[in-house]
């Protein structure tokens, strides 16, 4: 299956829909950041900062954060995986399976981070033992930098895929123009 992934057609509609969903989810994150006072726990990878933020959140902010994590943050990996995966498969064709590995790692670590974040928020809301919260926060602090590293790598691969698509389209247009000139001569 993996060796044939580059052969699956990636339609413009699907890519446009995935892009639109990503933009809507990013706007939702922006609104949530505003309601939470400027910082989302999803963006923090330092243990001390995570614990400090959890201590500063009011119960209302914890509930808003739980809603963001369950609603937006669980859908976002699916949306960007569709967008990035489609661009990579379309831009690199037969080479795409190897180039999709960072995306798969990214989605896995993002989902691990979301689950640990949800556990942190719920345990903080329930006023669980600080040692329990600290253990889960330490796990999140390990996972978040890996997630962002894979996000940067996957984004770079996606940009190269878009550049590849642009070059392919330019070559097709150049060949078409050349063929028309040859046709006029004969």
Regions found by a protein language model. Name each.
Residues 2-67:
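Interfacial loop at the N-terminal end of multi-pass membrane proteins
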Residues 109-173:
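Alpha-helical transmembrane segments of multi-pass integral membrane proteins
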Residues 10-17, 64-74, 97-108, 138, ...:
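Alpha-helical transmembrane segments of integral membrane proteins
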Residues 169-186:
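Short, highly charged, low-complexity non-transmembrane loops/tails of multi-pass membrane proteins
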Residues 27-44, 74-77, 107, 111-119:
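Transmembrane alpha-helix/helix-exit interface in multi-pass inner-membrane proteins
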Residues 67-88:
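Hydrophobic alpha-helical transmembrane segments
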Residues 92-127, 184-186:
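Hydrophobic alpha-helical transmembrane segments of integral membrane proteins
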Residues 5-8, 89-97:
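Membrane-interface helix-boundary motifs at transmembrane edges
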